[in-house]
Amino acid sequence: MSTATLDEARAAARSAGLAAGLRRVLARSTAVPCSAGGRAFLPAGWSGNVPAWHLPGGTLPRADARVRRHLHPLAGTCDLELVEVSPLVCTAVAPHDGPDFCPADELALLGVRIGTAERALDQATEHLAGRTSGGAPMIRYQLPRAAIADAVTELELCAAYRSCPADAHDRLCGVEQSIAGLFGGSGYLCAGPATSLYMAALVASTWTPVNGPGRWS
């Protein structure tokens, strides 16, 4: 199966945002993973393009799936939608009945999160350059500059974790929180400048296994 690479997804997310990065991954994916409850975040309007849904235990073809859209307070600000997927009939999803979510796609999702974080870091740098303290732009002070440098280093380390993307996804959570803090109080607002960071983490929580193989969020 052809899939977007980490670098391709990273570049798409950094240049055009979280939804653009996800579109790059999903355009060549055979199945979209869902959480244990059958929920997934997708680019708005994308659910009709999904060929199959990967639920814990097996894969559900589009023709056999019921897809419901749910309102989410933050998804729309990032051009995303929340869907809930279930079988059309009350039967168990047979294991190994279709293509699983490719490990390369999990790696590409890592690229989406890194690119989204880099985009937010670029915005945070501009934010600090436009604010003054003691008559000087905040970007000139040691603490903000050190925080930015640390974030850049951490993001490159996450990108280097290609053999273990699950560990990189865990590590990214701390980096995203650090970047959000660079915006000051606005970084903690709903629909604020750091919303894409929170949404990227939510997407990953439904797309990637947690607490070991076979266990999903």
Where are the predicted features?
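Short, conserved alpha-helical segments within structured domains
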Residues: 140, 144-147, 168-171, 194
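C-terminal helix-coil-helix/basic helical segment that borders enzyme active sites and/or dimer interfaces
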Residues: 136, 152-191
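Glycine-rich phosphate/cofactor-binding loops in nucleotide/flavin-utilizing enzymes
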Residues: 1-38, 50, 87, 183-217
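Glycine-rich beta->alpha junctions and the first turn(s) of the following alpha-helix
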Residues: 32, 41, 47-52, 56-153
